[in-house]
């Protein structure tokens, strides 16, 4: 077997030759990227590890353990399409399951359910959201009890500090429709979205999120939301990668990043199939990204 280091060199040279001389270079390059993924996984230079302990469980993160391997990845996969192809191939070559449910079987009796607490303000809309979230959690083995708070910030703080397992907060709670206040509360409390629901109001609908520090991602997730500190050029490349993976970008926003002077981009992605390849792409090429949530709309 050729050593991984030599294999990377051969693949890189082949890629350079393809770029300069061969016809149908895109087809040949695709094969080289696939071979790169195989070598990465087979050599152990790339590892996939499930999240354990206090965190968003049910996902696996990928890491490149060799600086040389990472250098070859960056050299061979400069475009969004190549990056997407590499991560799809890595997904295929890895055998571990992404979905690790703590409670894989639906539980039908309240006496079997584990009690969790959700913090929220007291009003008709939050109560309506709580009813939907309670039914959702019960299907996955949890019985929800409400902890009343005076403000949305207090509810988010309760989930962040461990006084509650979740908080129930509206996404569109600010003048711009959905953005600053909501994402600030998530960021400051290190909270992630577990699921969302639309609640009817007299003026339309308000989307509420169930957010917490620790929960299980479920198979029915249809939305992947993340943020990354980057520039406009890289943000455009991320959009191309998302499209190449077969997903749909539903929403993109940019905010001034605190203490840095740059921009923080938020991406909301509609998933087609699994999210593993997208997560791998972010792990490898944008390791400073922050997961906002992987969830479904109930």
Sequence positions of predicted segments:
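Domain-level signature for soluble enzymes in the chorismate/prephenate branch of the shikimate pathway
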Residues: 1-298
